[in-house]
A protein has these predicted regions:
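Long, histidine/aromatic-enriched segments associated with O2/redox biology
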Residues: 1-213
Length: 213
């Protein structure tokens, strides 16, 4: 409640920043806070491979997003103050918007994202039951090896992704590998496409670790 009130104050003070924030809870702490009620599909992430996709399983995620880094920073400070000793910050990542909404790989990210606030609500917000108004968050932090990527030809990069790099056009299904990123994430259930709202941004430093969060 304290953080929500502080967030509302910042939103009123900086309307042009289009500020928003989400507080999400991991499976274990949510079961404790809710008494086991709701969030039936909330589960711990199962790690994949030897370090390829580790499971961190943090208890709380605070995601802050706006058009101004200074506002984001101030809201993050307010969040830490509001939660106080009840949390111990394990990781703090600052993302940024890159050229033409592209990932550091040079490809446009989130092309198929649902457009418009109402459509996004329809896709992501739970409508009924004890979880009404809530949602699920799936967090992945990718580390990019851009040197290795840039050793590939643009054509090979496009075949790997499933879209053209400059024009951001989808490559026909028959012309792209079944192992391409686009082919793997084009999921359907009962013939209907499964949609998510992506909020990913590039992050990191030029001389150190960088990628997509």
């Amino acid at each position: 409640k304290v953080f929500v009130d502080k967030l509302a104050t910042f939103q009123a003070k900086f309307p042009e920043a289009h500020l928003g924030a989400v507080v999400a809870f991991g499976s274990t702490v949510w079961r404790h806070l809710s008494g086991g009620e709701g969030a039936e599909e909330l589960k711990d992430f199962i790690p994949y491979g030897k370090g390829l996709a580790p499971a961190t399983q943090y208890d709380v995620l605070i995601h802050i997003l706006s058009l101004r880094h200074d506002v984001n920073f101030s809201v993050a400070q307010a969040a830490i103050e509001a939660f106080g000793d009840s949390i111990d910050v394990q990781e703090e990542i600052h993302g940024f918007r890159w050229v033409e909404e592209r990932d550091l790989s040079g490809f446009v990210d989130g092309t198929e994202n649902p457009a418009g606030e109402e459509t996004r609500r329809e896709v992501a917000v739970i409508k009924d039951g004890v979880d009404a108004g809530g949602s699920y968050v799936f967090v992945q932090r990718w580390e990019h090896n851009l040197r290795q990527l840039n050793r590939m030809s643009v054509h090979d990069q496009e075949m790997m992704i499933g879209r053209t790099k400059d024009a951001n056009e989808e490559i026909d299904g028959d012309a792209r590998p079944v192992t391409s990123h686009l082919s793997r994430v084009d999921l359907k259930e009962d013939g209907k496409g499964l949609k998510i709202v992506r909020q990913s941004l590039p992050y990191g430093t030029a001389s150190g670790t960088h990628g997509l969060y």
